[in-house]
């Protein structure tokens, strides 16, 4: 598994860590990414759009604010989000512990 840390990912604040669960040959050209993402308190993954793909998050720890194509809502453990092709999203950690979620990008 490859682990990365990005600064100001997609124009967000602070650091976002990712642990890539599957490598390219395991994704079988059907998915672009399957990863566990960690966002520290006060940090965020900036708003971005998806084209030719969709993305799903499943929250496994912490709490945050999810920007769903311009509409913001709280997310916490057990919540699922879905961003279809042509739409955008972002997420910020609003809690006092790490926000951790699974992220899956499927190719359309």
Regions found by a protein language model. Give the residues of each.
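Ligand-binding loop in jelly-roll beta-barrel domains
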Residues: 65, 85-108
């Amino acid at each position: 598994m490859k682990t990365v840390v990005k600064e100001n990912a997609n124009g967000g604040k602070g650091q976002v860590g990712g642990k890539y669960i599957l490598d390219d040959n395991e994704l079988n050209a059907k998915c672009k990414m399957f990863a566990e993402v960690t966002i520290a308190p006060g940090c965020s993954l900036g708003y971005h759009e998806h084209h030719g793909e969709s993305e799903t998050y499943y929250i496994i720890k912490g709490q945050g604010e999810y920007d769903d194509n311009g509409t913001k809502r709280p997310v916490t453990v057990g919540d699922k989000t879905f961003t279809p092709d042509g739409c955008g999203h972002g997420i910020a950690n609003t809690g006092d512990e790490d926000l951790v979620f699974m992220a899956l990008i499927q190719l359309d």
